[in-house]
Amino acid sequence: MCHALVIEDDYLVADYIAALAEFSGATSTAIASTQEEALKSAKAKRPAVILCDVRLDKGCGPSAIGEILACLGAIPVLYITGIPEECPASHRAHSVLPKPFSRDAFVSAFRKHAGIG
């Protein structure tokens, strides 16, 4: 089972990322548009992988990741952002997929982080 949590405040982008995650092998997805929703969603169902934007309308992607990992332990994170340089140095151990991205680049990065074939 591979549950993916998408943290993205642009609904169309979030929906596209969730669809690509399912195409790439995720068995389920959840979408959170705020830092608070992300933490609630992760606590409700522990994700196998997190796909996260850096900037959110309410909150901050890296802050949401920090809270989730502090609560749930290690989870692979793939930042998907148009501004990779804004990803904090403390989070650069996680991978970054710059927007815009190709379907093939997403599939490859997702499968690597999710541990899928």
Regions found by a protein language model. Give the residues of each.
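Acidic di-acidic motifs
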Residues: 8-9, 99
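Two-component/phosphorelay signaling modules centered on CheY-like receiver
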Residues: 10-30
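Acidic, metal-coordinating helix/loop segments flanking the phosphotransfer/catalytic sites
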Residues: 31-49
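Acidic catalytic/metal-coordinating carboxylates
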Residues: 34, 60-63
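Active-site residues of response regulator receiver
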Residues: 53-54
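Short amphipathic alpha-helix used as the core "switch/output" element in two-component signaling
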Residues: 62-74
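Hydrophobic/aromatic residues positioned on beta-strands within the core alpha/beta folds
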Residues: 80-81
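C-terminal output helix
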Residues: 101-114
